Amino acid sequence: MSAPEPKITPELVASHGLKPDEYQRILDLIGREPSFTELGIFSAMWNEHCSYKSSRIHLRGLPTKAPWVLQGPGENAGVIDIGDNQAVVFKMESHNHPSYIEPYQGATTGVGGILRDVFTMGARPIACLNALSFGAPEHPKTRHLVSGVVAGVGGYGNSFGVPTVGGQTRFHTRYDGNILVNAMAVGLADADKIFLAAASGVGMPIVYLGSKTGRDGMGGATMASAEFGEGSEEKRPTVQVGDPFAEKLLLEACLEIMANDCVIAIQDMGAAGLTCSAVEMGAKGDLGVDLDLDAVPTRETGMTAYEMMLSESQERMLMVLKPEKEKEAEAIFRKWGLDFAVVGYTTPTKRFVVKHGGKAMADLPIKELGDEAPLYDRPWVESPKLPVIHAREVNAPNSIADALEKLLATPDLCSKRWVWEQYDHVIGGNTLQRPGGDAAVVRVQDGPKGLALTVDVTPRYCEADPFEGGKQAVAEAWRNITAVGGKPLAITDNLNFGNPERPEIMGQFVGCLKGIAEACIAFDFPVVSGNVSLYNETSGRGILPTPSIGGVGLLDDFTKSATLAFKAEGEAILLIGETHGWLGQSVYLRDICGREEGAPPPVDLACEKRHGDVVRGMIHAGTATAVHDLSDGGLLVALAEMALAGSIGASLEAPPDGIVPHAWWFGEDQGRYLVTVKEDDLLTVLSKMKSVGVSCEQIGRTAGHTLKIEGERALDLKALRHAHEHWLPDYMGGKN
């Protein structure tokens, strides 16, 4: 028998994250007071994390279609066609709140959840990436959070057997109370064998697969839909516990069952667990669902209907099976040592019925739980425009060389080797370009193709000007894919913002989305999947707006690619794109001058596309020997990164007349690349650039083992490498 359920009170409703008007909507919808289990189901399905109730109307403005898009937003992951009946399946998703409370488990289950999203579609995962945002290094919790999150990301990916090939790691005081853990997974599938979540057919068996259900993760989706306050540590029981070895078994069992043509529909149990997966399958298929919780495999005794429906135990799937394949499917899952249980059936009623102990614990209209959840058009105000900061208003350093050494040893610009060396980035044997470059490159097995993968965003730009910041996040992903020789095909986004009930925060969200949409349209770079994470605030203090962009591009021939490393001495260094010396919101202004001010650099999308297409053409023609896009830190930081990657120095000319030296070297103008070419190709390249109207000038030559700027002291690469690579391990070791 099911245990008695508590009485519904206003306090109980509020504790479930439901506003009074939302509860009234429930009463109007079902014509009675909900049961405790029903209240939990509504709370799970109508929270921000599952329903996107504050963001859906704005997400509709994103471009999602292209001839190569096989599946856009709305499924577990997006799917794009790369030819030869091959498809790339990918998505990015956040696990922010759990990772702040319990960093190791929060990060592991974030990775596990996004991997399930990919293999649920029928794809074998081939790569993971991540974007990690931590608080100020001096904050007492930051070191602990970095350690736990990085160990969790590596622990799950390494054990599961998928390489973690790239990402971002940043530090800023605005993340002190809310870190961000955005995980991206990429997989390969046959283009004609993609599996979706929509159930079809009446009377079809609904099967529970994978690990047993426990009480871990209770209320996780609801927690992710509210801001933190005092006592957030008490929410530790809502953090799920992951088992990468069980997930590996689940992957192999699912792919085998799919290959045997057993599956009608499949959905992983992520946020809101059994509730969300069952409702989504039924609602998308215009069907009802009857569940019998007595059949659910559990690992704890005495679990109530409420607990089973809202548990977020990991490594679980829900599947609608072809009835004649039931015994075959069960044999496959038993072989892999996983639970297999028929827990319900599809019905024609369009109702969601949950039974436990012979008693109906929930009987609700399924469409209103899923597709027709509340939708808000929240008030928003446009972010005020900040003044342009002119280069002559920014103090010059005592020495350009000294400033470079200092910048390379700052938290955001230092080498993140300490992070990515904890990840197995070569498992599987298909990683062609490892972390540390512009984009990772992963081979598509059994052929010449490669995938270029990147994650990008510059939150300080998004804070200063959400529209330009949104454009720039997409543009940088496009540039990074281009810089390795890839043709950018599509993106997934992970939109991390504060409390949407504050008009200024909603204004940031709307502005960033408009910028993302404009850039995606200009580049023919559609959005095929994504995630929205709101309420990233603690005690009223929100994060920087952080719309992470995960980009995927294709190399038809991975041998025609580029890296950022200088290849040989005596090669010409070319700067492609115009430099005006934009210092507003630059790392130089922040970390050398102590000012976070001004408008961010504008993004000219037409120039971005023209410059990128030319650079990609140079790579494919074999003319470019090294390529690097310019971003944080500007020209001189990018040059130092190329020199360190190749262990070859450079002799650099003085800035041209008319531009302030520190603005030339550290300005963050957009749409620029550094390219090296052999001496024999120099005149041809310069002539070609002039003919197509692309700004290109030689700024130096590769040489020796120092960076030597005309009029400045030479910087030994060994000293630069020490500055660049020691800050993070020293910090994590408590030395700074």
Curated annotation (Swiss-Prot):
Its main location: cytoplasm. Its EC number is 6.3.5.3. The active site is at 49, 95 (proton acceptor). Keywords: ATP-binding, Cytoplasm, Ligase, Magnesium, Metal-binding, Nucleotide-binding, Purine biosynthesis. InterPro entries: PRibForGlyAmidine_synth_PurL, PurL_linker, PurM-like_C_dom, PurM-like_C_sf, PurM-like_N, PurM-like_N_sf. Mg(2+) 2 binds at residues 117, 268. Mg(2+) 1 binds at residues 93, 531. It comes from the Bacteria. The keyword Signal does not apply. The keyword Metal-binding applies. CDD domains: PurL_repeat1, PurL_repeat2. GO terms for cellular component: cytoplasm. Substrate binds at residues 94-97, 116, 240, 312-314, 533. It is found in: Cytoplasm. ATP binds at residues 52, 91, 493, 530. One of its GO terms (molecular function) is magnesium ion binding. It catalyses: N(2)-formyl-N(1)-(5-phospho-beta-D-ribosyl)glycinamide + L-glutamine + ATP + H2O = 2-formamido-N(1)-(5-O-phospho-beta-D-ribosyl)acetamidine + L-glutamate + ADP + phosphate + H(+). Pathway: Purine metabolism; IMP biosynthesis via de novo pathway; 5-amino-1-(5-phospho-D-ribosyl)imidazole from N(2)-formyl-N(1)-(5-phospho-D-ribosyl)glycinamide: step 1/2. NCBIfam families: FGAM_synth_II, PRK01213.1. Part of the phosphoribosylformylglycinamidine synthase complex involved in the purines biosynthetic pathway. Catalyzes the ATP-dependent conversion of formylglycinamide ribonucleotide (FGAR) and glutamine to yield formylglycinamidine ribonucleotide (FGAM) and glutamate. The FGAM synthase complex is composed of three subunits. PurQ produces an ammonia molecule by converting glutamine to glutamate. PurL transfers the ammonia molecule to FGAR to form FGAM in an ATP-dependent manner. Belongs to the FGAMS family. This is Phosphoribosylformylglycinamidine synthase subunit PurL.
